[in-house]
């Protein structure tokens, strides 16, 4: 049944109509959640697990008494589907809806608030009636930058996720512009998907998946094949990609606390080399993952021997300097400055750290700070020609920036002056008009007084 017109015609309450004619949408078929579509939605697509959904709703007890309504608050209710943020009946019911659909749900207590209720409005063991309108839904933004949107087709098992360095076995299907360009089973190490022609967005998303999870990933160019594209697959530069990924199995990599100092130092040497290979290949996000491992393993390592301490400091210094370079390439200049700060905390006179921090600050238009760093480079190495050129660049950019500001402010002041002059002119015109009207009234009055005697008998 797709409407409740029958209920209107025979006088039945919507609750009674759903109880008699509603479709059982529970997996157990225990009539715990019954549904009637009041208004058919658009298209065939329905929300998936993890989607952010936007709804309007009215909630009533079985006796017809209203206990809640989003309409009364004049704003939609928003939640993530299938995450336990709402009652079970809603996670079940909204998952069956299409955009624009309005439906009625009748929910037994075990799919609502159960024996506890939700006092004072909802008593114990209450059967609830809802009218729900699905306004919109969209996938889960994994990193809140729009670069990776996940839509979960099948929920995974358990709560464990692969970590960086985990060995995973997945099935993937890649599409671009409606064309499938990749379909295979593949095993690889998370963070090293590039070695298997897998974009970095897959590595990132896998760290948020569970075993046997199946999802659709929408990757922006930054998390796809970027500006280079992928000629092997016929992918143009800056293409948006869609991947369907199933995580079949995984084995987690050792966590930092599971490794002794010797192992950490050995692994640091390995990942440093991997990071350098990625950097030289222009794979800066992949390089960040490798250099970041060194920081996670060694930054908080204590109780080292003198030899271990020197080795650890050397790896950390290289990692921070290389991370700064990667972040600058990724145009994440604030992070680049932070990494340089860490490097300079280990070696305050490090020329590379000072130079790279200066570069990042110059790109952030922090001209004085950048100039100061390049001057410090010259204190360390007076023969550094690049630093001298950068000081000249800072001075030039600062001058251009100041001149541009002066022009902007001059134009602003000119506009303000013109506006003030216009307002003064309007006031003067208004005053003149007012005086003219007064004079005309005086003349008319005088004329009437002169004519008045002639009108008398």
Swiss-Prot record:
TPR repeats lie at residues 268-301, 317-350, 351-384. It is an enzyme of class 5 (isomerase). The modification Phosphoserine is found at residues 13, 445. Immunophilin protein with PPIase and co-chaperone activities. Component of unligated steroid receptors heterocomplexes through interaction with heat-shock protein 90 (HSP90). Plays a role in the intracellular trafficking of heterooligomeric forms of steroid hormone receptors maintaining the complex into the cytoplasm when unliganded. Acts as a regulator of Akt/AKT1 activity by promoting the interaction between Akt/AKT1 and PHLPP1, thereby enhancing dephosphorylation and subsequent activation of Akt/AKT1. Its main location: cytoplasm. Part of a heteromultimeric cytoplasmic complex with HSP90AA1, HSPA1A/HSPA1B and steroid receptors. Upon ligand binding dissociates from the complex and FKBP4 takes its place. Interacts with functionally mature heterooligomeric progesterone receptor complexes along with HSP90 and TEBP. Interacts with IFI44L; this interaction modulates the kinase activity of IKBKB and IKBKE. Interacts with IKBKB and IKBKE. SUPFAM superfamilies: FKBP-like, TPR-like. It is found in: Cytoplasm; Nucleus. Pfam families: FKBP_C (PF00254), TPR_1 (PF00515), TPR_8 (PF13181). One of its GO terms (biological process) is chaperone-mediated protein folding. The keyword Nucleus applies. This is Peptidyl-prolyl cis-trans isomerase FKBP5. Its EC number is 5.2.1.8. Keywords: Acetylation, Chaperone, Cytoplasm, Isomerase, Nucleus, Phosphoprotein, Repeat, Rotamase, TPR repeat. InterPro entries: FKBP4/5/8-like (IPR050754), PPIase_dom_sf (IPR046357), PPIase_FKBP_dom (IPR001179), TPR-like_helical_dom_sf (IPR011990), TPR_rpt (IPR019734). It comes from Pongo abelii. Inhibited by FK506 but not cyclosporin. Residues 1-26, 420-457 are annotated as: Disordered. Residues 50-138, 165-251 form the PPIase FKBP-type domain. One of its GO terms (cellular component) is cytoplasm. It catalyses: [protein]-peptidylproline (omega=180) = [protein]-peptidylproline (omega=0). It comes from the Eukaryota.
């Amino acid at each position: 049944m797709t409407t409740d017109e029958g209920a209107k015609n025979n006088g039945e309450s919507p609750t009674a109509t759903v109880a008699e004619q509603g479709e059982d949408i529970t997996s157990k078929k225990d009539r715990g959640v019954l549904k009637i579509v009041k208004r058919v939605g658009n298209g065939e697509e329905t929300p998936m697990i993890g989607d952010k959904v936007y709804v309007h709703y009215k909630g009533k007890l079985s006796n017809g008494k209203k206990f809640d309504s989003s309409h009364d608050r004049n704003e939609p209710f928003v939640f993530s589907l299938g995450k336990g943020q709402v009652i079970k009946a809603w996670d079940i019911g909204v998952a069956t809806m299409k955009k624009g659909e309005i439906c009625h749900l009748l929910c037994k207590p075990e799919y609502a608030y159960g024996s506890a209720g939700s006092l004072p409005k909802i008593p114990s063991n209450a059967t609830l009636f809802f009218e729900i309108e699905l306004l919109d839904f969209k996938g889960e933004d994994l990193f809140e930058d729009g670069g990776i949107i996940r839509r979960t087709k099948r929920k995974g098992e358990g709560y464990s996720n692969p970590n960086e360095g985990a060995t995973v076995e997945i099935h993937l299907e890649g599409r671009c512009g409606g064309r499938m360009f990749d379909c295979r089973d593949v095993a690889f190490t998370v963070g090293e998907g590039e070695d298997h022609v897998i974009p970095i967005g897959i590595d990132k998303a896998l760290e948020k998946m569970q075993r046997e999870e199946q999802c659709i990933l929408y990757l922006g160019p930054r998390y796809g094949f970027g500006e280079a594209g992928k000629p092997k697959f016929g992918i143009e530069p800056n293409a948006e990609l869609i991947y369907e990924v199933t995580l079949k199995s995984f084995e987690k990599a050792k966590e930092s606390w599971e490794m002794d100092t010797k192992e950490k130092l050995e692994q640091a040497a390995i990942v440093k080399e991997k990071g350098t290979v990625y950097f030289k290949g222009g794979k800066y996000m992949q390089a960040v993952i490798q250099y970041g491992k060194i920081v996670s393993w060694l930054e908080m390592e204590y109780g080292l021997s003198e030899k271990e301490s020197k080795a650890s400091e050397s790896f950390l210094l290289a990692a921070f300097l290389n991370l700064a370079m990667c972040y600058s390439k990724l145009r994440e200049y604030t992070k680049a400055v932070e990494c340089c700060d860490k490097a300079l905390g280990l070696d305050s006179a490090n020329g590379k750290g000072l130079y790279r921090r200066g570069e990042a600050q110059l790109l952030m238009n922090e001209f004085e700070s950048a100039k100061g760093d390049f001057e410090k480079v010259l204190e360390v190495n007076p023969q550094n020609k690049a630093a001298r050129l950068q000081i000249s660049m800072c001075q030039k950019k600062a001058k251009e920036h100041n001149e541009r500001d002066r022009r902007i402010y001059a134009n602003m002041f000119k506009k303000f002056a013109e506006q003030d002059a216009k307002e003064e002119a309007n006031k003067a015109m208004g005053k003149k008009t007012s005086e003219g009207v007064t004079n005309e009234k005086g003349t008319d009055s005088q004329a009437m007084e002169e004519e008045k005697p002639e009108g008398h008998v």
